Amino acid sequence: MALGGGTFLVQNKVLPGAYMNFVSVAHASATLSDRGTATLPLDMNWGPEGEIFTVELADFLKNSQTIFGYAYTAPELKPMREIFAHAKTVHFFRLNMDGKKAANKFATAKYPGKRGNDLRIVVEANENSTDEAALFDVSTYLGTVKVDEQEAVAAITDLTPNAYVDWAKSGNLELTATLPLTGGENGGVEDAA
């Protein structure tokens, strides 16, 4: 509050004294945001090929296994954890191209790469299964973690794709203790030049 009781805007003050009005020129902030946007091309074992995909910090914390094929704490995700320490949004690009998808007689991995070799399919009899109408419980495992389960399925065509595998279009379900997906390979890193 200025001397004389008020802020000086116009010459209308009745009290004697010196009135001063300081106005600063607007200037750009020198502080940088610690939560911006970044881009990171990487050689990855899982994920879409040939496209840029965007991941938010909240998605990375919650769904890193679905997006990158590994749990948040896995050593394979250290570069991702480091960039998300100061970024809110990251655009990723998978450098390795022309990889092969792991597969078995029931399913094919969603993405090419050697991480698909850690997927396993387990087919068990459903508790409501009868001799006339066989029903199955089909589970998808990534390593030792169950990532999907579909219960009371009569045929392979009744299975819905999940975040890890696309199911075969034909064939018969049969009891299987565990059937790994095999043949997944990372492609080579392409030179952009």
Predicted regions and their residues:
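Surface-exposed assembly/interface segments
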Residues: M1-A193
